[in-house]
UniProtKB/Swiss-Prot annotation:
This is Gibberellin 2-beta-dioxygenase 3. Keywords: Dioxygenase, Iron, Metal-binding, Oxidoreductase. Pathway: Plant hormone biosynthesis; gibberellin biosynthesis. The gene is GA2OX3. Catalyzes the 2-beta-hydroxylation of several biologically active gibberellins, leading to the homeostatic regulation of their endogenous level. Catabolism of gibberellins (GAs) plays a central role in plant development. Converts GA9/GA20 to GA51/GA29 and GA4/GA1 to GA34/GA8. Residues 175-278 form the Fe2OG dioxygenase domain. It catalyses: gibberellin A1 + 2-oxoglutarate + O2 = gibberellin A8 + succinate + CO2.
């Protein structure tokens, strides 16, 4: 059954920086059944902080079902959706991204990956949707937890990280602070003169993010030379993004990828992003096995809770890690 989504009421003066010209580039594609997949993953994390995954083991019917249930929710009358908002941070939200004035052409649902910790807002989401929606969300979160821990295990093996599970444990434990976000970018009634912001440029603060969308374009990543690159959508695959926390723990060897979504189509876009985060009390610092000399560490130690709070106080596109970088000692020779 095809459902036509009702465009929400959004501001339309959100334009992309015209100095950023998207260009084609070959995004790494990694087949998880390949014998050298872990080597490819590490290379992609170093060069792009981003890669596409095929043969991931997640059932296609689960992806289709969750997408359709998300479409059904976003098609509800705004009076019903608004009962699950504004987000706290979980729940339903529109247009406003965070508390610091960032705006986008979207509406979204944000859910705690531990559904036992439901808020009043997330309870309202499932109250107005069929039970199959919650069931699909629960199974999807289970699959994302499996996949995120698998990726980190492969990184551990390739980099010979000790002790074992130093990274993957952070997303496996029940205290893991992970979440699932479902975004809906409504179709445009008129073709815009220039590209508009759906979700502004940013990096993700967690360890890694697993992104899956329908076949509508819009996602872009920023490569090393500062150029924005269009990512060709593929509804059957996942895209993995390195987050700030993994950048710190690898002492900058992996780079968290700056990305954004632009709306330049009459087709609506649905995306689902699983943010795999560590426990709130976890101490985050460069891994000693990767940085034998303490003086070579680029970042000071902090807890995930501290970083999360700091990120919450910033604008979407701010460089959040700057507050936690080690500064070279002051010297008169530098004056």
């Amino acid at each position: 059954m095809v459902i036509v989504l009702q465009p929400a009421s959004f501001d339309s003066n959100l334009y992309v920086n015209p100095k950023c010209k998207p260009r084609p580039v070959l995004i790494p594609v990694i087949d998880l059944t390949d014998s050298d997949a872990k080597t490819q993953i590490v290379k992609a994390c170093e060069e792009f902080g981003f890669f596409k995954v095929i043969n991931h083991g997640v059932r296609p019917d689960l992806l289709t079902q969750l997408e359709q249930e998300a479409i059904n929710f976003f098609a509800l009358h705004h009076s019903l959706k608004d009962k699950a908002g504004p987000p706290d941070p979980f729940g339903y939200g529109t247009k406003r991204i965070g508390p610091n004035g960032d705006l986008g052409w979207l509406e979204y649902i944000l859910l705690n990956a531990n559904l036992c910790l439901e808020s009043h807002k997330t309870t309202a989401i499932f109250r107005h949707t069929p039970a199959i929606f919650r069931e699909a969300v629960e199974e999807y979160i289970k699959e994302m937890k499996r996949m995120s821990s698998k990726f980190l295990e492969m990184v551990e093996e390739e980099l010979k990280i000790e002790p074992k599970e130093k990274l993957s444990r952070l997303v496996k434990v029940k205290e893991s602070d992970s979440c699932l976000r479902m975004n809906h970018y409504p179709e445009k009634e008129e073709t815009p003169v220039k590209e508009e912001i759906g979700f502004g440029e940013h990096t993700d603060p967690q360890l890694i993010s697993l992104l899956r969308s329908n076949d509508t374009e819009g996602l872009q990543i920023c490569v090393k030379d500062g150029t924005w690159v269009d990512v060709t959508p593929d509804h059957s695959s996942f895209f993995v993004l390195v987050g700030d926390t993994l950048q710190v723990m690898t002492n900058g060897r992996f780079k968290s990828v700056k990305h954004r979504v632009v709306t330049n189509t009459k087709r609506s876009r649905i995306s689902m992003i699983y943010f795999a985060g560590p426990p709130l009390s976890e101490k985050i610092a460069p891994l000693s096995c990767l940085v034998p000399k303490q003086d070579d560490c680029l970042y000071n130690e902090f807890t995930w809770s501290q970083y999360k709070l700091s990120a919450y106080k910033t604008k979407l596109g701010d460089y959040r890690l700057g507050l936690f970088e080690k500064r070279p000692p002051f010297s008169l020779s530098n004056v």
